[in-house]
C-alpha cells in the first residue's frame, strides 16, 4: 500500500497481488484528489482506493449489491450525500448513512474517513480493449484512461454523486469529462 497526502486528504492506494500496474499510484492518488476537490469533499479526510480483479469485484458485487458477476467499480461511502455541497448530480435522499451532523464529533484535527473505492483493473483492461469504455460503453481508448475514469467515477460516488436519473447522470458524466481533460 502507498499513502499520499494531497490537499488535505490522505489517499491510500492498495494494489492486490497479481493486479497489473497500469498507472502509477501517485497518478491515481492525484486523480482521486481532483475528484474530491471538484466534489467539495471535507478536509482533512482519508479515502482508500483498492485495485483488485474481477473475482474480488464479483464477490463484493454479490455481497453488497445483490448482483452476480464482476463490475468495474464499487464505492463504499461513509458520509451521507448531505455532507457534501449541493450539485446537479447529487444522490437523491440520504439513505442509512450517518452524518457528522447526526451527533458524532471527531476530535480536533482528526481525519474524517470518506469511504473506500474498489476498482477491477481486469475489467478496465477488458472494457478498453473491446471499445466498451467511457461509462457509456462505446469509447475506445487506452486501459490507463479507463482506469482513471473508473477511479474518478468511484470517488464521485463516495462524495454523493449518482447517475440514477437522467439529470444526475448528465451532470456526473460532464464532471468526469472535465476532470479527465
Name each model-derived stretch.
Residues 1-148, 156-181:
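An acidic/histidine-cluster motif and surrounding catalytic segment
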